[in-house]
From Swiss-Prot:
<dbReference type="InterPro" id="IPR019480">
    <property type="entry name" value="Dihydroorotate_DH_Fe-S-bd"/>
</dbReference>
<dbReference type="InterPro" id="IPR050353">
    <property type="entry name" value="PyrK_electron_transfer"/>
</dbReference>
<keyword id="KW-0665">Pyrimidine biosynthesis</keyword>
<dbReference type="GO" id="GO:0051537">
    <property type="term" value="F:2 iron, 2 sulfur cluster binding"/>
</dbReference>
<keyword id="KW-0813">Transport</keyword>
<feature type="binding site">
    <location>
        <position position="218"/>
    </location>
    <ligand>
        <name>[2Fe-2S] cluster</name>
    </ligand>
</feature>
<dbReference type="InterPro" id="IPR017938">
    <property type="entry name" value="Riboflavin_synthase-like_b-brl"/>
</dbReference>
<protein>
    <recommendedName>
        <fullName>Dihydroorotate dehydrogenase B (NAD(+)), electron transfer subunit</fullName>
    </recommendedName>
</protein>
<feature type="domain" description="FAD-binding FR-type">
    <location>
        <begin position="1"/>
        <end position="99"/>
    </location>
</feature>
<comment type="function">
    <text>Responsible for channeling the electrons from the oxidation of dihydroorotate from the FMN redox center in the PyrD type B subunit to the ultimate electron acceptor NAD(+).</text>
</comment>
<dbReference type="InterPro" id="IPR017927">
    <property type="entry name" value="FAD-bd_FR_type"/>
</dbReference>
<comment type="subunit">
    <text>Heterotetramer of 2 PyrK and 2 PyrD type B subunits.</text>
</comment>
<dbReference type="InterPro" id="IPR039261">
    <property type="entry name" value="FNR_nucleotide-bd"/>
</dbReference>
<feature type="binding site">
    <location>
        <begin position="74"/>
        <end position="75"/>
    </location>
    <ligand>
        <name>FAD</name>
    </ligand>
</feature>
<keyword id="KW-0479">Metal-binding</keyword>
<dbReference type="GO" id="GO:0009055">
    <property type="term" value="F:electron transfer activity"/>
</dbReference>
<dbReference type="Pfam" id="PF00175">
    <property type="entry name" value="NAD_binding_1"/>
</dbReference>
């Protein structure tokens, strides 16, 4: 973990209120799929950092890409960043995805919902690099909210579900995955809690890893703002920022 400043290379709105932010900095060397950064807004009245998942990184170029959606004052502040600006960053943080499994999987299903889609990109890229057959299933409210279909196509097959039917299959991600003829060797998923619950219920016998989306304050396990009950004892809790955000599906109670 490192508190540092990163420089903005580029920022682009790639979907409705969704921005692609390209940063450069030394902390890229320590990044792994599924981790996140805590970004500090520039406004003095916004005291709390905001957690943003890492979409991708290039350790040789020392660059990373963050995708985020404007949800409030903090992310609106980030959307005003432009080339050459700097931003105060804490990270990379959290426990990411386990991609070095034994035995190695031959097929992997990556399921993302909304702003839970971004971490699936680097994960899919690295799995494909290991020879794993990757299938992406991305869920959005509407076509105007969708992003990164072309980029993900470089590393696997991409399926899209939209609630209003304006792109891909009308419905939810499980309306696609429940019709697959065979189950994958491993599943990775990130998105809203209701989606993760549905994924967990649909594949009870498949090795599944879930990246939880929780509101965070500190990002380092000190404040207990982002806890999740343990599956084997609801009185005990995981700290999502420190113990996660990635957990085995059988570890957590959603």
């Amino acid at each position: 973990m490192l508190q540092t400043e990163m420089k903005v290379i580029q920022q682009t709105e790639i979907a409705d209120k969704v921005y692609e932010l390209i940063l450069t900095g030394e902390c890229v060397a320590d990044m792994s799929p599924g981790q996140f950064l805590m970004l500090k807004p520039s406004r003095s009245d916004l005291l709390m950092r905001r957690p943003i998942s890492i979409c991708s990184y290039d350790k040789t170029a020392k660059t990373c890409i963050l995708l985020y959606r404007i949800e409030g004052d903090g992310t609106r502040d980030f959307s005003k960043l432009s080339e050459g600006d700097t931003i105060d960053v804490l990270g990379p943080l959290g426990k990411g995805f386990d991609i070095d499994q034994t035995p190695a999987p031959k097929t992997a299903l990556l399921i993302g919902g909304g702003i839970g889609v971004p971490p699936m990109y680097q994960l899919g890229k690295e799995l494909a690099g290991k020879g794993v057959q990757v299938t992406f299933v991305n869920g959005f409210q509407s076509a105007k909210d969708s992003f990164y279909e072309k980029e993900m196509n470089a590393y696997g097959t991409v399926h899209i579900a939209t609630v209003d039917g304006s792109l891909g299959t009308q419905g939810f991600v499980t309306d696609i995955t429940n019709n697959f003829p065979e189950e994958p060797d491993v599943i990775y998923s990130c998105g809203p809690k209701a989606m993760l619950q549905a994924v967990k219920a649909s594949f009870p016998e498949t090795k599944t890893y879930l990246s939880l989306e929780e509101r965070m304050a500190c990002g380092i396990g000190a404040c207990y703002a982002c806890v999740c009950p343990k599956a084997d004892d609801a009185k005990k809790q995981f700290k999502v920022c420190e113990d996660g955000p990635v957990f085995r599906a059988d570890e957590v109670s959603l």
